[in-house]
Amino acid sequence: MKKELIVFIPSIEDGGVEKNLFEVSNYLSKNKINLEILTCNNNMSTNFSKEIKFIGTKNTFWQNKNRSIKYLACLIVLFFNLIKRKKKPLVFAFQANMYATIIAKVLNTKIITRSNSAPAGWSQNLIKSLIYKFCINLANEVMVNSTEFKKLFEKKFQVKVTCIYNP
């Protein structure tokens, strides 16, 4: 039986994260992982193997919306997609980690989160930081892309972090 994985990335743009997304997704697909990409940017499908299924909004209306709108749209799709499945897939969140984790945990689904930005820039607010700490500790696995981020996450959020360098 093939393993199932939903890659949650509401907004696919041009950058290093996306390059990693293409490489990792295509690698997993070649290695017999049933992979689905949940995004508002179906226009980026040409960068992926033909075996990879795109779920989410198909309408081009969403492609040029801001990240917050894309996050909301894809979180709604994630919620209903997980509800209708008998066998729950693993969710791998590239973006909107906190929100995707809440949905996954409410629906008894395993989730891996990936963070590639240092918490110092976005976690200055104490309440926001405490909420994030609570949510990130619900994830089954937390990944970062450098030993520096690993140390920062472990210290600030008291969470076990795996460091996987960019391919």
Model-predicted regions and their roles:
Residues 90, 138-147, 162:
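A short beta-strand/loop micro-motif in the catalytic core of glycosyltransferases
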Residues 148, 167:
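Carbohydrate-associated surface elements
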Residues 1-6:
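Extreme N-terminal starter segment of soluble prokaryotic enzymes
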Residues 74, 92-99, 115-116:
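Short His-centered aromatic/hydrophobic patch
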Residues 7-66, 149-154:
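N-terminal strand-loop element at the rim of the active site
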Residues 90, 104-121:
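Active-site proximal beta-strand in glycosyltransferases
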Residues 41, 93-97, 146-147:
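Helix N-cap/beta->alpha junction signal
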Residues 79-83, 125-143:
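Membrane-proximal helix-turn-helix segments that form the acceptor-binding/catalytic region
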